[in-house]
């Protein structure tokens, strides 16, 4: 034992001796606390101690220090068998650990402790090895359990089993339905079944997909994606799991699409090929064009049965023996948007799709007159009404023309520089207004962004947009013009890292670099969750000296609005549902709170009877019975498929590992053992990623290397011995790392035989 180590141990013993009176006093206080257990008044000064005692029982690693001293005792005290909380000895625990170690040694054929077999390991080394095996096992297990719970909760936000739904509109009088009840459910053979496969009551807006089923006939409506949040590292989007449909492919008689937003068509390239060329696909011209654009991304493009529908012809499409469909034009933020009138043996089902009310639209007004005729002559037995914007009070306040006029004001007010407008690439009518405003002022327009250019091409083919003569130029040509003649329309309004606008900010764009004379217009609102990314982009623009104008901040520039929501406001819903007078009401397309508020509106304002309103979840089976009442009756299995940026599937287990790594990191140990002798032939290699920086952790790494030398100080030749060694190293290193850092990275021991 060297001098430094002797001094350290002596200091440790002095500290323990100094603490003994304090430890004894606290132990007596703990013993006396029971006198107050059955009284109404407890001493105030014991409150902190009681809380800390509870934390101790749960193995919390608290830093609270009553009286200015560590209530748990120093790590060195605990390592030497002294519990700082009450002064008791941990000899029993030490015996238990020794017994476990002896058992492990016997498994490996070890006839004693590694230190005994290695003369180079003295008593001091043995003590170090014992320290390597954590005496904070309870804390570590608690940490791992809480981490596992957090990781599972984060990775399974969209995993759908039997969702908790105790809403008074849940169809079970507010009681939570059980698995046993669902298994016992038997459908009415004459019922029309409405089954949301995705997009209903989930965490986020998207993944819309609904099935209408009658006996052996099914209609599938929409196939959308839901873009993943940052809680899902490496996952770009998710789509519905359609196992139920794959098990019933012969029953699917038609696939219908309400419109071309990605939350309604984004899963087409993954799902449509499963149905083959015989299943007819119905949608408007623009929507079909956008679906074909999606399908063109597939290497082996399948043959599909596309059918273009003109909603203004009021055509009744007989898709099966008992089911027919009529597309009804509804105003939205994209051309070709429709609601669906589905005629069934049990009455008319109206599915609204996405819609908004607008007094003076660019697009044709919603075909409410046709819906009035249907209500008058047939009635609506069940209405599925979207819920997205139900929390916005009043009526939709503006028109797309207002947005166009305000974009013109920007061009007038900032006439001497370039105007760069960022919006959603699907905002075809908005883009048309920008072209018109630029044409009036003698400005030229260039488009930037892959999706932007593709969508405009589809719109031109479907005759959904008019381009003024000699207004559009290529990007490489427009940069040659004076700044006051340049308008650029680009993607990136959501602060996407690799979108055009961000690349302009960072100087990574091939043609455009932001400069102080530029004016950037955000003709959009941040999608919930994207706000930090938008702020980051705005900061970058302002740092370059550019003028930034955002929708919703009219008080800063006196220019606005610059964007419209594509969804109806609260009073618009009241008017619409009142107009259609549905017998039964099923909110859909929205998060749970949106659907709940939608249901409350239908009951409290419109006056629909409570027992005719249901709030469903993905997978719930809603039956429309022959007597035109509705009920929930069981569930089907639903879920999600996850995909990355390359459109490749990502397994849930991989997501969990990524989350764990992002929080705790990876620690890899590579042991190289001779095939002949079975002994370690080189210093173990240690690799740390997203955990600790090795150059700053020499003491910890030295301790781990010493542990590994002792642990491998015998011949390891058979595979069972290698397997046991891996497990022991993994467990012990995890404890060592937790003792030193409070974290439990994924420990990967690798044993190479050479």
State where each predicted segment sits.
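Intrinsically disordered, low-complexity RNA-associated tracts
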Residues: 1-179, 183-186
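C-terminal tails and terminal domains of large nucleic-acid-associated
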Residues: 3, 719-754
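His/Asp/Glu-rich metal-coordinating catalytic cores
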Residues: 152-256, 261-480, 499-513, 532-536
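Short glycine-rich phosphate-binding loop at a beta-alpha junction
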Residues: 282, 586-587, 748
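Conserved hydrophobic residues forming the short capping helix/wall of the S-adenosyl-L-methionine
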Residues: 295, 602, 737
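Extended hydrophobic secondary-structure segments that form protein cores and membrane-embedded regions
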Residues: 307-309, 383, 489, 615, ...
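Flexible glycine-/small-residue-rich
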Residues: 329, 344, 490-492, 671-675, ...
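Hard-cation-handling environments
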Residues: 392, 396-700, 705-719, 726-727, ...
């Amino acid at each position: 034992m060297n001098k430094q180590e002797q001094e350290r141990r002596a200091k440790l013993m002095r500290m323990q001796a100094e603490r003994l009176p304090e430890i004894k006093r606290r132990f007596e206080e703990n013993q006396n606390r029971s006198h107050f257990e059955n009284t109404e008044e407890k001493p105030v000064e014991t409150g902190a101690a009681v809380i800390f005692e509870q934390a101790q029982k749960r193995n919390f690693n608290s830093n609270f220090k009553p009286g200015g001293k560590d209530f748990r005792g120093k790590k060195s005290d605990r390592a030497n068998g002294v519990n700082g909380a009450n002064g008791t000895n941990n000899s029993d625990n030490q015996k238990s650990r020794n017994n476990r170690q002896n058992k492990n040694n016997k498994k490996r054929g070890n006839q004693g402790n590694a230190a005994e077999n290695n003369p180079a390991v003295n008593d001091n080394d043995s003590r170090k090895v014992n320290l390597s095996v954590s005496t904070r096992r309870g804390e570590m297990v608690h940490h791992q359990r809480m981490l596992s719970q957090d990781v599972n909760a984060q990775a399974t936000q969209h995993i759908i089993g039997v969702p908790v739904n105790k809403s008074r509109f849940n169809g079970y009088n507010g009681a939570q339905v059980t698995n046993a009840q669902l298994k016992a459910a038997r459908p009415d053979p004459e019922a029309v079944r409405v089954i949301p496969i995705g997009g209903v009551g989930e965490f986020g807006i998207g993944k819309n997909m609904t099935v209408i089923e009658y006996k052996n006939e099914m209609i599938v409506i929409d196939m959308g994606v839901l873009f993943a949040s940052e809680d899902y590292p490496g996952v770009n989007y998710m789509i519905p799991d359609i196992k139920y449909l794959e098990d019933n492919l012969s029953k699917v008689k038609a696939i219908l699409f309400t419109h071309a937003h990605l939350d309604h068509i984004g899963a087409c390239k993954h799902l449509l090929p499963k149905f083959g060329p015989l299943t007819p696909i119905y949608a408007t011209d623009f929507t079909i064009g956008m679906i074909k654009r999606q399908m063109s991304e597939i290497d082996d493009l399948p043959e599909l049965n596309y059918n273009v529908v003109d909603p203004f012809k009021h055509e009744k499409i007989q898709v099966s023996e008992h089911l027919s469909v009529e597309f009804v034009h509804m105003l939205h933020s994209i051309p070709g948007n429709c609601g669906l009138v589905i005629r069934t043996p049990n009455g008319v089902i109206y599915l609204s799709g996405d819609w908004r009310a607008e007094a003076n639209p660019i697009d044709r007004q919603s075909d409410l007159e046709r819906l009035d005729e249907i209500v008058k002559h047939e009635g609506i037995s069940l209405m599925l009404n979207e819920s997205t914007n139900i929390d916005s009070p009043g009526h939709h306040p503006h028109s797309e023309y207002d947005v166009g006029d305000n974009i013109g004001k920007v061009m007038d007010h900032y006439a001497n520089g370039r105007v760069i407008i960022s919006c959603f690439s699907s905002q075809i009518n908005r883009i048309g207004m920008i072209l018109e405003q630029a044409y009036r002022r003698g400005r030229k327009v260039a488009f930037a962004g892959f999706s932007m250019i593709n969508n405009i091409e589809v719109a031109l083919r479907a005759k959904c947009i008019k381009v003024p003569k000699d207004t559009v130029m290529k990007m490489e040509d427009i940069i040659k013009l004076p700044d006051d003649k340049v308008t650029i329309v680009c993607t990136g309004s959501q602060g996407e890292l690799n979108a055009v606008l961000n690349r302009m900010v960072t100087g990574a764009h091939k043609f455009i670099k932001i400069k102080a004379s530029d004016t950037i217009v955000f003709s959009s609102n941040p999608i919930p969750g994207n706000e930090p990314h938008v702020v980051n982009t705005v900061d970058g623009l302002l740092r370059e000296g550019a003028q930034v104008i955002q929708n919703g901040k009219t008080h800063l520039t006196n220019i606005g609005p610059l964007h419209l929501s594509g969804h109806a406001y609260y009073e618009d819903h009241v008017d619409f549902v009142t107009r259609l007078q549905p017998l039964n009401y099923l909110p859909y397309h929205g998060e749970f709170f949106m659907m709940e508020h939608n249901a409350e509106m239908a009951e409290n304002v419109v006056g629909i009877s409570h027992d005719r309103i249901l709030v469903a979840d993905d997978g719930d089976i809603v039956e429309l019975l022959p007597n035109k009442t509705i009920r929930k009756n069981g569930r089907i299995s639903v879920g999600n498929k996850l995909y990355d940026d390359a459109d490749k599937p990502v397994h849930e287990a991989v997501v969990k590992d990524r989350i764990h790594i992002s929080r705790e990191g990876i620690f890899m140990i590579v042991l190289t053992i001779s095939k002949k002798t079975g002994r370690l032939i080189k210093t173990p290699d240690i690799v740390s990623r997203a955990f600790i920086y090795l150059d700053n952790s020499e003491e910890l790494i030295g301790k781990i290397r010493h542990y590994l030398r002792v642990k491998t100080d015998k011949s390891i030749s058979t595979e069972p011995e290698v397997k046991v060694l891996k497990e022991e190293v993994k467990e012990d290193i995890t404890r060592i790392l937790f003792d030193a850092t409070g974290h439990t990275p994924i420990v990967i021991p690798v044993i190479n035989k050479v």
